[in-house]
Amino acid sequence: MASENVFDVAKKLGYWNGKEPFKFWKAYSGKNYSGQLKSFSTREHFILNALAPSLKLDYEAEELPISVKPDKQVSVTDVMALLRETYEGTPLDMTQNLKVTVKDRKTGKVDTIISPKANPWMRGDELNMLNGIKKGVVKSVRNIAVPQCAYSTVIQLRNWLPDAVGGVVWFSMDNPGQSPRVPVFCGITDFPAMYKICGNHRYRDDAALWHYRRANKLAAVRWGTARKVMEKNIRHFEEKGQRELPFVEAQYQSILQSKGEEAARAYLTDYTADFIGATILRWDEMANQYWIESRFGF
């Protein structure tokens, strides 16, 4: 969508000569947010390439297609995994050079591993310090999962089911690479109080965001160690949501038939609230454990 004078303004301001094919991105920006003369960034290239590797999309190209047809059917959990991406194990991995040698206490075997202190969400001052010690040891990359994220969604729509239960927003607060996703059905009529409060401008214990963020930030301090528990809990709630989804759909339909729409929607509302409560409790427990593990210092 654009205003009717989109071409005229581009000509008047010298952004487009009127002879070449008009490209909005080139006329009104000409570069991505990293200043590169292209229409896309690392994140777009990574996701499109992951979905359609057969296209062999070239990062050195000036532009990419706005969308691609995936090589195979994409599941909801596939999309969730993409939104957690930090390019680990690829040439874009920010932690790949942050290695230490460790010695096994029992065998005496020495190995080189990524430092437990390394994490893919380092602030600029950390990057500057590390690159000051050894130039180029860390290259700043815009990950798909970023710590400044307020929330992210994976929207699942099934037209063969009633709208109230066929539409599910898999919702996550804070960093998508560290937080769980909760199923928010289109038919719910209310949210838990903590989900109605914004915590982005100041710390609030009554805002759900900070119950996730507290554990997430503490985990990043020693990510190599803390991630084991956090990723296990992320998987737990992802698998729980997928496993229980058919049951919830059946229950909704049964209640709808026997008690009516209001009761059926109340069931969905309660289910979402219970799911949210379970994730908050688990992330609070993790944060407390991370504090204990940090009692001798970070």
Task: Show which residues each predicted segment covers.
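C-terminus-biased signal that marks the final domain/tail of proteins
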Residues: M1-F298
